[in-house]
Amino acid sequence: MQQQHLMQMNQNMMGGYTSPAAVTTDLIQQYLDENKQLILAILDNQNNGKAEECERHQAKLQHNLMYLAAIADSQPPQTAPLSQYPSNLMMQPGPRYMPPQSGQMMNPQSLMAARSSMMYAHPSLSPLQQQQAAHGQLGMAPGGGGGGTTSGFSILHGEASMGGGGAGAGAGNNMMNAGMFSGFGRSGSGAKEGSTSLSVDVRGGTSSGAQSGDGEYLKVGTEEEGS
């Protein structure tokens, strides 16, 4: 009963105003601006003691507020944006589904096979390293009898040396000096049996000597003197 009475009062107040169906935002903004001016006028009238004008402004303000309230009641509820979203997209409590990952994991055998293929994919020496090794030092070490002798052949910066060890503990050396320090040596079996040396001087002198097993040194030399 009371609600019907309020609706009837609203209709009576809205008799001189535009119907709610033709209301626009500009019209609502005009009412809001007018209400602001009415409030300021009411405060001014109260300060100045103008009671009649204050009551008239209050009645006008109340009328405008009732009209705006009636417009708000006549508008349909705006629930359309909420209904646009499907219900299955709403967040639901509960554990999340996790897909199985067993197919993505690798067993230890496949990991070992992949590691082996990566280790043996490249050769031990590159072609550049093989070429450097071929032009570098060439060594041959065949095993001998007795004390494990070695023989080597090396070519390095113009110097050639060849040495071989016998079955004994020590070996002598034969040196031939031709101005460029290139030596050719041979050692026989036995310990300190003998050594011979032959040297050719650049000036034309030759000398030869022999050392016997007793340690004596015999020197036989011939020198060519200019006439």
UniProtKB/Swiss-Prot annotation:
GO terms for cellular component: cytoplasm; nucleus. InterPro entries: SS18_N. Residues 186-227 are annotated as: Disordered. It comes from the Eukaryota. Expressed in shoots, aerial roots, ears and tassels. Expressed in the shoot apical meristem (SAM), young leaf primordia, leaf margins, inflorescence meristem, floral meristem and spikelet meristem. Disruption phenotype: Dwarf plants with narrow and small leaves, reduced number of branches in the tassel leaves, fasciated ears and sterile florets. Keywords: Activator, Transcription, Transcription regulation. Transcription coactivator that plays a role in the regulation of meristematic function in leaves, stems and inflorescences. Regulates shoot architecture and meristem determinacy. Binds to the inflorescence architecture gene UB3 (unbranched3). Regulates the expression of several genes involved in inflorescence architecture. Component of a network formed by the microRNA396 (miRNA396), the GRFs and their interacting factors (GIFs) acting in the regulation of meristem function, at least partially through the control of cell proliferation. This is GRF-interacting factor 1. It comes from Zea mays.
